[in-house]
């Protein structure tokens, strides 16, 4: 909550459990030096949490933006970052930011449990590249989503942060066509859209919070998972997976959201400065991800993953035949769907 001294990173870290102890401890150590800088006597202290490793490009650019905010406001606004699920899983933090216990949160697919239309940019195979993605989320589609986010007591900042196109990793077989997905135990985020898509393709999807995925893969609770290459690398999934199939089945990004009641305690000029600098950080992070994606495949091959390129058309046809697109067109509504197709082209 704003204007209260944030809980120390050390105290928060003691709440992590299981495999989280390994990943979060590493993140907390990095967070202490990279993300934990704070002013001694700021007028407004804000807590910002996310479930991403401290080394992820989002956390690096967020830390830079928070430093810039502190400087631009002459130390009046101090945002302390808690990466790596130090404040709980994504579902927990979404509840916290709604209640005001957390001030700012970078939220991805779990937002769809409250605002279903927030998942629409992630419709399977909607965008072949980033040009279409940024045109949509920086344009009318993003504006529509931000307006909906405002109905649950949150403020969504203008620029989405990039998570990337998602790829499938498995421990038992590569995925070359839809038949290879039949019966696969696949971890998916806590999101109805993801569960619906992979069920339509014949998998056995299991919704698991990100911080628990490594353990689920290690103990064979699931055979595989799907995430962008940056997260596959940062979370070290290559240690417990053998194959990476470049399906590029969904793009996903993160909204930077703030508790409206808390955020409006800041004077307008400080709010505008905070939003402007965090938006700038988002745009820089998009460029970071584009650069990183050029080298990640080579790096992950060196770490033991075997890659295969996938023809996406059979997957799209299978989803269309299963009624996936028609189902979600009905759920999102005609206005939102037509807005999406202005950027993606016809999907259903």
Predicted region positions:
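N-terminal secretory signal peptides
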Residues: 1-17
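N-terminal secretory/targeting leader peptides
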Residues: 2, 21-132, 140-141, 147-348
């Amino acid at each position: 909550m704003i204007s209260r001294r944030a809980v120390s990173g050390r105290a928060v870290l003691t709440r992590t459990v299981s495999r989280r102890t390994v990943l979060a401890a590493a993140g907390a150590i990095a967070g202490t030096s990279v993300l934990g800088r704070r002013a001694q006597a700021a007028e407004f202290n804000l807590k910002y949490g996310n479930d991403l490793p401290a080394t992820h490009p989002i956390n690096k650019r967020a830390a830079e933006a928070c430093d810039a905010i502190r400087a631009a406001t002459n130390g009046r606004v101090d945002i302390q970052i808690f990466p790596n699920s130090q404040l709980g899983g994504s579902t927990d933090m979404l509840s916290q930011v709604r209640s005001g216990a957390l001030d700012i949160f970078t939220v991805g697919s779990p937002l769809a449990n409250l605002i279903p239309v927030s998942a629409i940019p992630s419709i399977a195979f909607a965008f072949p590249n980033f040009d279409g993605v940024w045109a949509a989320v920086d344009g009318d589609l993003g504006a529509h989503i931000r307006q909906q986010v405002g109905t649950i007591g949150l403020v969504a900042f203008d620029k989405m942060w990039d998570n990337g196109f998602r790829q499938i990793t498995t421990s038992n077989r590569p995925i070359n066509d839809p038949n290879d997905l039949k019966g696969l135990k696949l971890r998916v985020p806590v999101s109805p859209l993801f569960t619906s898509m992979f069920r339509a393709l014949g998998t056995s999807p299991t919704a698991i919070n990100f911080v628990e995925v490594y353990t689920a893969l290690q103990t064979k609770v699931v055979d595989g998972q799907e995430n962008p290459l940056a997260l596959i690398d940062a979370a070290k999934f290559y240690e417990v997976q053998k194959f990476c199939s470049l399906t590029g089945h969904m793009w996903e990004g993160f909204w930077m959201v703030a508790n409206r009641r808390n955020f409006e305690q800041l004077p307008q000029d400080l709010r505008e400065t905070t939003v402007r600098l965090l938006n700038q950080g988002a745009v820089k992070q998009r460029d970071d991800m584009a650069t990183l994606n050029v080298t990640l495949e080579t790096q992950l091959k060196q770490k033991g993953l075997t890659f295969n390129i996938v023809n996406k058309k059979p997957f799209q046809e299978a989803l269309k035949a299963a009624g996936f697109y028609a189902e979600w067109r009905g759920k999102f509504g005609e206005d939102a769907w037509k807005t999406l197709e202005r950027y993606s082209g016809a999907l259903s």
